[in-house]
């Protein structure tokens, strides 16, 4: 008999990744979740078109939105009526009143403009801002889409020459790319400085959401059609692109995907993010949004992706239902049902967020999103 201690070997199954459930509700009376509606509530905005909102918690503890805005309804995103970016603050303090969101924000007035087009490659607009803050340095970073054509001759691409509609100006408005501005005083328009960034091919494609971390690397998600992730040690040079979010044939998002909001951290350390998409199916179509949970240790890893849309167009302001909503930008663009530009996530506490988006490219919307870990 061998009197020896044999090693005890235990086989332990690898832990399954956490799973999350996401619940979405529309705040406001009867789900009327619209803000900055220039037609039905002109007292809330000086701009005919208000869309593409992004959220930031200012360093003084005030919630703020940056909004893509056009002064006139017709010919938005042309040299004569380009998109600008405004910043409006929440005036109320304490817990947010979900039944009266509009009443807690400043008017989106002309004096709230913080970024205007500069140069031929922005002559048609500065669009779809996504803002975040580096709390270690006190520096705000805002990525936006520059829309124009840097090669166009100024004699044929100006407010007088190219006409009042986008169709007449299409030859002047055909290039898009991400640019970034930074400041330590976000309400002061003159303080925003365009920064020079470099990177591997495609780092400055249209639509960029940035995750600034206390310790590098930092990350960004960029692109339309397919979203890729990038990393940086200093927020100025971006490398090592990887596919992050691509279309899923057979799912609600079979093809087009576009970067959404800067990710927000969940209680367990992972991140929650959004993306825009074009849904398709027998009973649904149009612009909508999806969601992902990213690994807190490696935000480039998608731990879970929603099997159903986060939000999809079902209400009159998203379907352009006449006569109340047939004035919107989306009608001019062909009348496609639309919830787009889910560019902001506002933490409410306890893994509950306000997701900011726009309806029909014309008004701001908000949705309450509750994330639950299994």
Named regions from a protein language model:
Residues 1-15:
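Cleavable N-terminal signal peptides of Sec/SRP-targeted secreted and luminal proteins
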Residues 258:
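ATP/pyrophosphate-binding catalytic subdomain of soluble kinases
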Residues 16-124, 133-255, 265-335, 348-374:
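Beta-rich carbohydrate-recognition and catalytic domains
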């Amino acid at each position: 008999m061998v009197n020896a201690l044999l090693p005890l070997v235990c086989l332990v199954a690898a832990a399954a990744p956490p799973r999350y459930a996401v619940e979405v509700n529309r705040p406001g009376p009867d789900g009327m979740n619209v803000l900055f509606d220039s037609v039905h509530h002109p007292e809330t905005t000086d701009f005919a078109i208000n869309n593409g909102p992004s959220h930031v918690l200012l360093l003084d503890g005030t919630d703020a939105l940056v909004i893509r805005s056009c002064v006139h309804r017709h010919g938005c995103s042309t040299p004569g009526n380009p998109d600008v970016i405004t910043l409006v603050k929440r005036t109320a303090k304490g817990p947010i009143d979900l039944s009266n969101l509009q009443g807690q924000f400043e008017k989106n007035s002309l004096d709230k403009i913080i970024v205007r087009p500069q140069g031929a490659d922005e002559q048609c607009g500065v669009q779809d801002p996504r803002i975040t803050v580096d709390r270690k340095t006190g520096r705000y970073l805002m990525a936006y889409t520059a829309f124009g054509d840097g090669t166009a001759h100024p004699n044929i691409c100006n407010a007088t020459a190219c006409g009042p509609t986008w169709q007449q100006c299409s030859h002047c408005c055909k290039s898009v790319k991400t640019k970034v501005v930074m400041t330590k005083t976000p309400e002061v328009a003159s303080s925003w400085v365009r920064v020079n960034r470099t990177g591997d091919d495609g780092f400055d494609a249209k639509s960029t959401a940035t995750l600034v971390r206390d310790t590098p690397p930092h990350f960004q998600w960029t692109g339309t059609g397919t979203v890729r992730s990038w990393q940086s040690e200093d927020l100025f040079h971006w490398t090592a692109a990887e596919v992050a979010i691509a279309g899923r044939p057979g799912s609600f998002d079979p093809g087009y995907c576009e970067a959404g909001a800067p990710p927000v951290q969940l209680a367990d350390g992972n991140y929650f993010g959004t993306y825009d998409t074009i849904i398709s199916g027998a009973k649904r179509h149009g612009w909508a949004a999806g969601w992902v949970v990213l690994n807190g240790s490696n935000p480039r890893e998608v731990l879970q992706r929603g099997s159903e849309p986060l939000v999809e167009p079902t209400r009159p302001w998203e379907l352009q239902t006449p006569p109340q909503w047939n004035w919107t930008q989306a009608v001019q663009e062909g009348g496609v049902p639309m919830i787009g530009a889910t560019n902001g996530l506002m933490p409410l506490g306890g893994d509950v967020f306000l997701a900011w988006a726009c309806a029909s490219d014309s008004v701001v919307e908000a949705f309450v999103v509750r994330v639950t870990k299994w």
